């Protein structure tokens, strides 16, 4: 349950709840996140807890409440300084954690939340957590088909063929082609939207081209294969390394120790996309037709550009 009302953001989940003894430290002290508990939570975005601690420090009001098996603890802060600490027993609430905060206007000045941006983030979480319902300001969001739903909801035109949806251990992909130009990708790592891509997206782009060329036994130019593509990839990586704290670009070379990201993605698509195209001959025919059209258009444009350069060169020679 998520709400933004009068500039106060509130989030209530229904998981296990933060251990009551650790609640205050978990939201205010560094190096107290889940990663410091051993081998658990390896395929997560972080769990160092830096984000929640930063929000605490930069909020004029911050509340953390955890409920576990009939007991609860509520801790409040202001600018990161503890204000109160309350323990309760005999609580008839579902287990879970509640966080609310009001950003400090002395730090940020006047501000407003972009609710459309928040809504899109929530939609992304639904695609990656099948069947999990997110409630935001009175509206509910849930996905039953994962990345396939993402593609269907983000395409602005009818796809040339039914979107391809493939999934396996630690990977899920969805692929379609439209009639536009360029390439469009949505990539995720351990539930985090990587808007600037990274090693997983680079491997995905390479794998699509490699698999398609091998399927048709044609040495197509990769750009002709990928032009007009809209696709999504989600991978689960052990101890992911991002290129910045914002975690919008993955830098990990391996998906897990000893397994390279490139080989993992290339091998997955090499098997599953190839199998799909063999089983869906109509899709394979439509895709090949699109590739050939892209090739003709690219060569035609290249020819026009070459002629224009030659004309300009002749013109300069006569000046």
List PLM regions with ranges.
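Short conserved segment of the HATPase_c
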Residues: 18-33
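GHKL-family ATPase ATP-binding module
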Residues: 1-14, 36-37, 43-44, 49, ...
